[in-house]
C-alpha cells in the first residue's frame, strides 16, 4: 500500500541500503491491531517487505525519515492519490485516511523480531 510513498527516497543517494536481515525483520513485522494487520498483510506487505520492490522497508527507519519530514498529511495524500511508484490507495480500497496514517506510523517505526 504505502509502497509508493516509499520509492521516492529509497533511491536517493546517501541513504543506507537495507540488508537481508532488515528484509527478514520487515517480513515478520505486523501491526498489533488485528484489523490493521489484515490490511497491512493484504495491501502493504508485498512491497514493503521486499528490497527488490524499492519501496521503503517496514521498520527500516533510515528510509522513512526523509518521508516523515514531509508531514503526515502529505504522506497520506501520496498514498490516497498515488505518487511515483505508489499506486493510488496502495491496493487498499477499504482503507480510510486514518488507516493510511496508522499504517505509515507502523511501517516507519523500528521493529524487533527474531531472525
Q: Model-derived features: where do they sit?
A:
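Sec-dependent signal peptide recognition
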Residues: 1-4
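Gly/Gly-Pro-rich "capping" loops immediately C-terminal to redox-active cysteine motifs
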Residues: 49-77
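The canonical Cys-X-X-Cys-His
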Residues: 40-50, 103, 107
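Extracytoplasmic/secreted proteins, especially bacterial periplasmic and envelope-associated proteins
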Residues: 35, 39, 63, 74, ...
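Axial heme c-ligation environment in periplasmic c-type cytochrome domains
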Residues: 55-56, 78-115
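Post-signal peptide N-terminal segment of mature Sec-exported envelope proteins
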Residues: 19-43
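Bacterial signal peptide processing site
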Residues: 11-15
Amino acid at each position: 500500500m504505502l509502497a509508493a510513498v516509499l520509492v521516492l527516497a529509497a533511491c536517493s543517494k546517501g541513504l543506507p541500503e537495507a540488508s537481508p536481515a532488515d528484509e527478514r525483520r520487515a517480513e515478520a513485522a505486523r501491526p498489533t491491531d488485528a484489523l490493521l494487520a489484515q490490511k497491512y498483510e493484504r495491501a502493504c506487505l508485498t512491497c514493503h517487505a521486499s528490497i527488490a520492490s524499492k519501496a521503503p522497508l517496514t521498520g527500516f527507519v533510515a528510509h522513512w525519515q526523509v518521508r516523515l519530514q514531509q508531514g503526515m498529511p502529505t504522506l497520506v495524500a501520496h498514498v490516497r492519490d498515488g505518487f511515483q511508484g505508489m499506486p493510488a490507495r496502495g491496493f487498499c480500497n477499504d482503507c480510510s485516511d486514518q488507516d493510511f496514517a496508522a499504517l505509515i506510523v507502523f511501517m516507519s517505526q523500528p521493529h524487533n523480531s527474531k531472525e
